[in-house]
Amino acid sequence: MYLNGKSLYESHLLERVLNPQPFPDSRDRGASTYTWFCESDDKNTYLYANFHSQNPNEHLVEINVRDSCFYPDQPGRDYITVCGFRMCHAATQWAAPTAEQIGLIGTHWSKGWIIEHNEISDSKCSGITLGKDHATGHNVWTTDRGKDGATHYNEVVERALKAGWSRAKIGSHIVRNNTIFNCEQTGICGSLGAVFSQITSNHIHNIWTKRQYGGAEIAGIKLHAAIDVLIQHNRIHTAGRGMWMDWMAQGARITGNLCYDNTTEDIFLEVDHGPYLVDNNLFLSSLSVSDMSQGGAFAHNLLAGKIVSRLETGRFTPYHPAHSTAVAGLTNISGGDDRFYNNLFVGPSESSSNAPDWDGKTQRATGFGLWVYDTRKFPLQTGGNIYYNGARSYTNEANALVMSDLDPKPTIVEEGDSVYLHLTLGPGLQKATTTFVTTELLGKARIPNLAYENPDGSPLEIDADYFGKKRNAAKPAAGPFENPAAGELKLKVW
């Protein structure tokens, strides 16, 4: 239900409409007291709503029961372009990775769509879905609770492969230049169906702001099997979790994204084996990276928040031949085998908040800098990293540049439709022992034994910065910006 275009909060009890109380976790607690309730008998459906002092007869009140706004009736509707629409108000269902994922707009297990220059908002769950179909399994855990979620999903992957899940039939979508907001599960999600796609230049915000429910599928962008997917130059904020690459993010490149004001973290990498590349990003929330994977490469990022390093020995997840959906094997996450080159790590404003945070039971380490990887089974490759304001380096890191007495104070300021980053990196930036990042430097991810390369198999190099400015191959600047000034900076980042 909507009042003047703004969705009300659904309640499961009439009492909470008659006597509403603010939802404690909502990011707009005042709005959370505008509530509605529905009940039915054999003949009628009754709707109750609390509009406070506003007379609904004098305002626009809308009721919506549609499961989507634009969604094909069957899989395989390929090569459709959706451009220039304003789409809003859909009663979408929860889009689990083992289910058919129906969004406000969705591709329904197809190939080659272009979704661009649209404004998409107010989905009960997901905005855009690039997900799988019904036939490969639909909420399979509800019919067999004797198996754990990883087993169910591995079986879904096997069924999808038998049904033709491949570059030839699925994925290769382009999602660009859209504005997506007011969705309570994801801005963009896709289980298996987003392979080989490009998600670029989207503004995704106000995701999971009501917080009436939670779950393991909530983010600005949430993908399972981001195989050879490019996620570039997106602005993701006020989204709970910014990006979530869950299972099989092999060959993915996550580059040049702006993330801030995300209360969970900016990016979560879950049970991926590599190779994948995370470069030139601005991770400015209080928790920058949650890493429950291995085999990743992180280069030229600005990480202003904490890092979490976790193992996952209980789940066995797929890895693949290069640039393929075929499964080469299954294994768990022992941790490490990551590469960190030319990054900027910013510590806390108070030294006490960088005290070691170690949970022996879950093998989880949390803190500012790469020390959280010190105990991991597989070593890191490192070089050219700078540690500010108490952020701590990896124990075995050679030539780390530590500037504990300098706080860059990265601050985001929104001015109309533009976003500016204020920070001070100091004159010591040029002292970092940096290296030009290439396929040769990064080597091969241990588990799949594959190189970090472009989706077409050609060697890659990080030859441009966040703004597209050419990098100095002889001595690139650490961080996302090539040759920034030493004084206080004001950079237009969106």
Predicted regions and their residues:
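Extracellular polysaccharide-degrading/modifying enzymes targeting complex plant/algal/animal polysaccharides
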Residues: M1-W109, S121, T129, T136-W165, ...
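Short, charged, low-hydrophobicity "junction" segments
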Residues: L14-R29, S53-D67, E100-H108, W113-I114, ...
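Short, solvent-exposed coil/turn segments
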Residues: D42, V65, T98-E100, A168, ...
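Extracellular beta-strand/beta-solenoid scaffold signature
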Residues: N64-F70, P97-G106, K124-S166, N182-S191, ...
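Right-handed parallel beta-helix
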Residues: D78-A91, K111-C125, G137-A160, R167-T186, ...
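C-terminal/domain-terminus segments
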Residues: I188, S197-I207, S353-Q381, P476-V493
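Extracellular beta-rich repeat passengers
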Residues: M248-A249, G256-L258, N262, F268-L425, ...
